[in-house]
């Protein structure tokens, strides 16, 4: 299939680029190997912030008297529920990204994208062409011998 633009990676850089290109009248596809929204939205930034919010609320409850409040009973964190809430937040946001892609007529291609030539991409055995390919795959930390993490 031929597109004007194919974006590889659906994180904050990728899905925003795809949406903007579509809004400008381009035929766009977005390739993602996992859930829409990428690592940041599904496993990094967003779930971490949800976990931190639970810790913040717990801290507020523990210091309720400083705010003129008396809580009846003990405030106890439930790790399973805290993690479930974090996963739920990430899932909701991922579905939101998928909705925005659909709303903007962007083809979401699930799979691992691999450049094969200029303007050509292969995703799990299927070949695609585009006038432009945007690589928005993010990064992974890498340990170097002279600078261990």
Can you say where each PLM-predicted feature lies in the sequence?
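Beta1/beta-strand and adjacent pyrophosphate-binding region of the FAD-binding site
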Residues: 1-13
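Glycine-rich flavin
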Residues: 2, 19-26, 31-149
């Amino acid at each position: 299939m031929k597109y004007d633009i194919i974006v590889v990676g659906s994180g904050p850089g990728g899905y925003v680029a795809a949406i903007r290109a579509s809004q400008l009248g381009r035929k766009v596809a977005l390739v993602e190997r996992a859930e829409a929204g990428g690592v940041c939205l599904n496993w990094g930034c967003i779930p971490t912030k949800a976990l931190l919010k639970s810790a913040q609320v717990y801290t507020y409850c523990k210091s309720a008297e400083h705010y003129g409040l008396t809580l009846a009973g003990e405030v106890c964190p439930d790790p399973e529920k805290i993690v479930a809430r974090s996963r739920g937040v990430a899932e909701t946001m991922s579905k939101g990204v998928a909705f925005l892609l659909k709303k903007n007529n962007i083809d979401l291609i699930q799979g691992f994208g691999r450049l094969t030539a200029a303007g050509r991409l292969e995703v799990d055995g299927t070949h695609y062409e585009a006038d432009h390919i945007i690589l928005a795959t993010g990064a992974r930390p890498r340990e170097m011998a002279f600078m261990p993490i």
